[in-house]
């Protein structure tokens, strides 16, 4: 990560990317359309967003990173799924859609963004799970990524 990119801007990019990936999984809408909705503000009322999720409405977002994560996950979702599959104890189609989006996002970062330490990837996924997924999803996400990390990324 370059010195000019702040961690908060990356965190915001991940949050937007997670929600956009989740939206794509549900709708299968064109990535450019989903990206535009998130970046133009059409997806959310900004004041409402500030009240419910202040971090998402923060003025700092690494937009280039958001775009990379969204397009990268969508374009390589089948490959990412094949890397995730060995570490989940149930069929992929039985995963909660938010858990799947989280795992895809984290696996993309682990396999394609070696400039981001794997511990940061796992921690960010856990924090996102605590906010956006079911109550104990962060434990599941942590377990899967912890098992996968040594096999997909050199520590």
UniProtKB/Swiss-Prot annotation:
A Pfam family matched in the record? NusB
* GO annotation (BP), single: DNA-templated transcription termination
State the UniProt keywords alphabetically.
Answer: RNA-binding, Transcription, Transcription antitermination, Transcription regulation
The GO terms this record gives for MF are: RNA binding
> Does the keyword section mention Ribonucleoprotein?
no
Q: Which GO terms describe its cellular component?
A: cytosol
Keyword RNA-binding in record = yes
Entry function: Involved in transcription antitermination. Required for transcription of ribosomal RNA (rRNA) genes. Binds specifically to the boxA antiterminator sequence of the ribosomal RNA (rrn) operons.
What family is reported? Belongs to the NusB family.
Provide the protein name. Transcription antitermination protein NusB
Q: Which gene encodes it?
A: nusB
């Amino acid at each position: 990560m370059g010195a000019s990119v702040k961690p908060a801007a990356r965190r915001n990019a991940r949050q937007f990317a997670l929600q956009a990936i989740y939206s794509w999984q549900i709708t299968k809408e064109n990535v450019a359309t989903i990206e535009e909705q998130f970046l133009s503000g059409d997806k959310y009322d900004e004041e409402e967003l500030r009240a419910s999720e202040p971090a998402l409405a923060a003025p700092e977002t690494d937009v280039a990173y958001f775009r990379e994560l969204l397009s990268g996950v969508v374009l390589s979702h089948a490959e990412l799924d094949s890397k995730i599959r060995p570490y989940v104890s149930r069929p992929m189609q039985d995963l909660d859609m938010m858990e799947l989006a989280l795992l895809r996002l984290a696996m993309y970062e682990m396999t394609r963004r070696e400039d981001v330490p794997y511990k940061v990837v796992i921690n960010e996924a856990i924090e996102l799970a605590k906010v956006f997924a079911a109550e104990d999803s962060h434990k599941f996400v942590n377990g899967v990524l912890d098992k996968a990390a040594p096999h997909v990324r050199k520590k």
